[in-house]
Amino acid sequence: MGTYMCDLCGWGYNPEVGDADGGIPAGTAFENLPDHWECPLCGVDKTSFVKV
C-alpha cells in the first residue's frame, strides 16, 4: 500500500489512515476505494491521484 496525492489540490490519501469523513476505514488500499470516492478537499475522482 502506498500514499497517493491529488494532482489538483495536493491532498494525500494515506491507506494507514483512510478517509474517516468519507467512510473509508484505515487499512483500505487506494486500489480498493469505491469508484464513487472523490478527493475530500477538491472533489475530483480518484483518477486524478498519483502514487507518491
UniProtKB/Swiss-Prot annotation:
Fe cation binds at residues 6, 9, 39, 42. InterPro entries: Rubredoxin (IPR024922), Rubredoxin-like_dom (IPR024934), Rubredoxin_dom (IPR024935), Rubredoxin_ET (IPR050526), Rubredoxin_Fe_BS (IPR018527). The keyword Metal-binding applies. GO terms for biological process: alkane catabolic process. Its cofactor is Fe(3+). Keywords: Electron transport, Iron, Metal-binding, Transport. Residues 1-52 form the Rubredoxin-like domain. It comes from the Bacteria. Pfam families: Rubredoxin (PF00301). One of its GO terms (molecular function) is electron transfer activity. Binds 1 Fe(3+) ion per subunit. Belongs to the rubredoxin family. PANTHER family: RUBREDOXIN, RUBREDOXIN-1-RELATED. Rubredoxin is a small nonheme, iron protein lacking acid-labile sulfide. Its single Fe, chelated to 4 Cys, functions as an electron acceptor and may also stabilize the conformation of the molecule. This is Rubredoxin.
